Amino acid sequence: MSNERVSTGSLGERLMLRTRSTRGSVRETLSKAIRSTLGRASSMERKDMPDRPKYGTALTAMTSTTPPSPKDRSSDSGDGDSPRPRKFSSKECARIYFSNTSSEHSSRSNSSTPRRVRHTTASSGYGSLSHLPPISYRKSSDPLNSLMSQSMYVQSPGMHIDEPKCTSLSQRRLYYEDSSETYIPSSPSLTTLKDFMMTNDDETFDDFDFDNDDVKSVISSASTSRIFSVDNRMSKYQKNQSLRQFLNSPVRLRKRGDTSRRDAVEAGFEPRDTVPRCHSTQSLRDVQRVRSYNNSQFQASDLSLNPNGSIRAACDSTSGSVAPTAVVNPARNHVISHRQQHHTSYEKDLIPHHNIDVDRRRSLQALNGSSALYQLNNGGSPNGVRSQFSPSDLSIHTPVHHVGSRVRVSSVNQICDSNSAPQFSIDQRRSVHNIGNPVRNSFVDGIKTTSTPKNQIAVAPLAHKSRHLSESRDEMRGGAERRGSGGQMNLPAYTNYLIRHSGEERLVDGPVTNASDARIAYLEKRIRELELTQKEQSSHSTPSQSRHSSSKSSHFNGSSNLSTSEQLRLQEMSDELANKDRKVTSLESKLLKAYQRIERLNEEYDGKIKNLMYDSERARDDLTRCVDKIQQLENELDETRAAVQNGDHANEQEYHELRDKIWKQERELQESRTLLTRLREKEAEFERMRSEKGYLELKNENLNKKLEAKKRAVEELERSVSTLRLEQTICQQSCSSGSTPLADEMEIMSDIRPSLARPYTKAHSTLGSHNMSPLSHSKSSGLTKSFSNFALNSSKQRDDITANMSRSIREQNRHITMCRAMVVCLKDTVDRMARGENPDVARLLGVKLNVMSESEMEDDEDHEADASQPFSMMSAESALSKQCGKLADLDKDLDTIRCQLADWHGQTNAEGDGDRDVCRVQ
């Protein structure tokens, strides 16, 4: 977590603002710093000057004299998140404030002479603390005025907060309107007073301006007090104390326990017990002595100042890190270059934060052998450059205004070069007599010649001793406890850091001796001496010189002669006062802008509140509708449940009826499936019978054809028998006279006729023609001689074909018969394929066994039996005519097969089932 510091305020005062880099921008930081500075106003005023409010209280207005109730206090002292009502708007405050002070502001901003010269009286100067009453802070109702800077006014003696008296805005004037009486902030410091107020009231910081989480800002003046953020909650024993008791009490002083070494390590240091120590009281004396020579312009010797007034930390030769820095006086104007232009109005009069690297933290071990811890630089170098100071990486566009001084803790063995500035050891810096006239002259010459009039001094860090564990717990549990100091000079301070397991910030500080009360007494004595010196100088000097001479006389033990360095110092102080006047004017303009911005933020906040109220009302309406809808749905659900419970019995009865119907339908379905199986079996049987019917029809057709052939054969035989009878009759008539050669031949041929008649015997018996049997030998014995004669005569006239031709006719007839049977079976197979049925392949393979009819087999047997006998002309003609009929039938069957195959192929392509595995006929 990085720290950013911004310093602003009047002379001897500054506002230390530490922000977190992860929370908010620099502009918001500066805005909160301005609000915090201008908002810490107190209602306490001096009794003898009721109509002259101090600087910074011009905007304080009490609309009611009634103190806030404890309930209001408890609400105000919360965590800073609860808004509180305001009595009047910020825009009205700004209008009243600037209407009363516009003329003074314009005249003061154009003048180069200092106007804010504070005169010191016996009761308000650097005297005792008797003029400060016991402070009990009462919270104002205005949040902007609740945290006004206390460094801008001095409490009046005997003033009590319990008085409800408050002046109006018209009766109040700024403190510099009356040039005859102005005031210097008295000791103790404002930080100490703030701590005292916090111990007496838990509601010191307003929750609007003080935010422990985002921005932490405190007001401090020239003192040895450490800048830190405190917890608003204080223990009971710190309540209701007077200021002197608070200053003398050991509670205010920092405790040293066993945890100091751990705290130093957490802060980034390496503590050792042998580190040279700078006591707070002795440091005050040394700084006061040196200030008379360097004109109050203190800078750490290892810092680099560029013409823009920026600060650049030099690298340590020992550890390569940077020592912590504490800003103790207001600095000159400069602006960071990388910020946007519209941010410069908030930042041009404030010191930007230090760009200090985290890894460049200095070590306290480098202080062991330090021989030149305190060195004064005259600001010049042999080659014309300002010693070891190099320009920073900050802005270079803002003019230089050298205001205020800084003190930086250094941990290098030798901070400056030996040829650039005189060196002083730790022992030498204890006495002012060790600083001789040559050193003074060198400082005067350095102020005249260098471009920056600021000279530097480095202060050694304080050694840390262990704290007791119980004291560490007390610090973590209780409020912040710091050490106060008197005087207007600043002593070195350390960087704030966060203690573990605690939300408050503590500082590493030097150990406190047991003679803390003696130190307070010494400081009070010193203040009284300074007061007497101030009274002596005020009688014969101007108001401006009176203030500076009082500081000078405090350093030189009452010396009344003004040297050249003192004149230069007075001139510089005049310039500083003029710069402060310009800063006041700028801050007033910034305040107006801040009030305008606050008013604008209030308007935006009101708008957001209205929108949120509207959204909440709409959400409430939506919620109401949603609740009503849910209630309606619940009612419907209850009704549905009731209806379901009442209708369970009816539904159960219907369910049983449906189950019975389903069971019956399943039984009917099973019966239908059984019937379908039977029908499919019958259909298969029908298809088989159908195929057998076709076969039987084909066989019947063949038998009919054979029957017709037999009939024709019978008719031919009858004609031949008639012819033979006729011939026999003729022979008998011609041969009636006796034996002739023809009769002898008939006797010889009688042995051959049975063989001729043999082929017809079976046919005649089959047809039942018993009358057509050949003539008996007994009946024809009388004609033998005449018949033989006729046979001899007719044998010479008979026309038979050759035996080879007869065999060819018989073979051709047999092949035609087989082809005819094959074609018939193939036709039946193709017909079944066309109908989508499985073909009977076994029938095709067994054509000869299944297809050949009995008549055809008998014909084959007859032809084989008569194969040796040649055909006659008439028999040959009959056989050829039969063969022609068979060939015609064969051609007809082949044409039918061709047509069926064509139809089957087209049907297969149309159905996309051309690749199915079926019986293909080659």
Curated annotation (Swiss-Prot):
Primary place of residence? cytoplasm
Segments of skewed composition (Basic and acidic residues): 43-54, 70-94, 256-276, 468-484
Q: Which UniProt keywords apply?
A: Cell junction, Cell membrane, Coiled coil, Cytoplasm, Cytoskeleton, Membrane
Localization annotation: Cytoplasm, Cytoskeleton; Apical cell membrane; Cell junction, Hemidesmosome; Cell junction, Adherens junction
Q: Which GO terms describe its cellular component?
A: adherens junction; apical plasma membrane; cytoplasm; hemidesmosome; microtubule
Q: Which residues form a coiled coil?
A: 564-728
Quick check: keyword Metal-binding in the entry? Answer: no
One GO term of the biological process aspect: nematode larval development
Q: Bias category Polar residues: which stretches?
A: 1-10
Low complexity compositional bias, start-end: 99-113, 539-563
Which domain of life does the protein's organism represent? Answer: Eukaryota
**Cited function:** Plays a role in the assembly of microtubule arrays in the germline acting redundantly with ptrn-1 to control circumferential microtubule assembly along the body which is necessary for larval development, viability, and morphology and integrity of the epidermis. Required for microtubule stability and anchorage by binding to microtubule minus ends. Recruited to hemidesomosomes in early embryonic elongation to direct the nucleation and growth of non-centrosomal microtubules.
Task: State the name under which the record lists this protein.
Answer: Non-centrosomal microtubule array protein 1
Source taxonomy lineage? Answer: Eukaryota, Metazoa, Ecdysozoa, Nematoda, Chromadorea
